[in-house]
Amino acid sequence: MRIFLFSLFVLAAFSSYAQDVTPVTVPAKAVAQLEKIRKQTQVIREVGKKGSSLPAETRPILNKILVQSATDFLAITKRKAGPTKEAYYQSLDAMLARLHPLVPQLEDRQQVAEYYQDLLDIVGIDSSEGRLTTFVEGAAN
């Protein structure tokens, strides 16, 4: 009985590990594209060119988080162990949680979601698995 329980525990541990690591094949130009989008976002923050319904004091905070997101995606992309979907999703979840209280309007949430979809597209991930939809629809709740 102990051997059965032990082997069940070991199999469960290995299966959970296997589910936690989904390697991503990142396109060759991803690093350059992420650096470009990060620089563009920094310029928008500094110059304040992009229109929005957000209060003026919120815009620099929002852009700082967007720049941090691009920086995080760059760091994940450059990992020696290789990037994983879960690492990108973890970064996405953390940043969306920070942005949630700052972006109450649906139109602004849609713009933010488009930015993150661009980041995901750059690194070769087709879907946010509902994360961006949940973020955008959170404005209605």
Language-model-derived ranges and their functions:
Residues 63, 89, 132-133:
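Short, well-structured alpha-helical segments
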Residues 20-74, 140:
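Short terminal alpha-helical segments
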Residues 79-122:
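Amphipathic protein-protein interaction modules
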Residues 1-4:
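Positively charged n-region of N-terminal signal peptides that target proteins for export
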